[in-house]
Amino acid sequence: MQLQRSKDNMASHAKPIVILLADDDEEDRMLTSDALEESRVVNDLRFVEDGEELLDYLYQRGRYSDPDAAPSPGLILLDLNMPKKDGREALREIKADPNLRRIPVIVLTTSKAEEDIYRTYDLGANSFITKPVHFNALVDVMKEIGRYWIEIVELPSGAPHR
């Protein structure tokens, strides 16, 4: 027996989710946003600039204390090299918290270091993707992320905040 889904059928199964992008580089945030838009991965995209702000968002602290300002993400795109608290530290805290650990975290970074790959998977990352250099390649990556994480897999509904 062969299982096939048409693109239309898959698109009808896509559920809108909040995508939270944690990246300190404004240009990378805008390129990723443009690539998501170009790839037609239409969702609610939110930005944070470092690991501390990411955790503030997830725990609804500080400027994110209003639940409308920080809806629960269905997916986190995480850069590793950020100021204040880097992506590795933030990932460790997210995956150690029973209220947050189910949120899929995709590491999206310029690193190709094998040490980073092993370490982030050991910390609980769901995927490790090296940021493509060319915009069209980034669009292709965003299409595949959207296809897999939004159209194909079943994600838990928003993780409860503390």
Feature annotation, model-predicted:
Residues K84-K85, I94:
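Hydrophobic residue at a beta-alpha junction
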Residues T110-K112:
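Short, conserved "switch-loop" micro-motifs in signal-transduction and mechanochemical regulators
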Residues N126:
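Short, glycine/charged-rich "phosphate-handling" switch motifs in NTP-dependent
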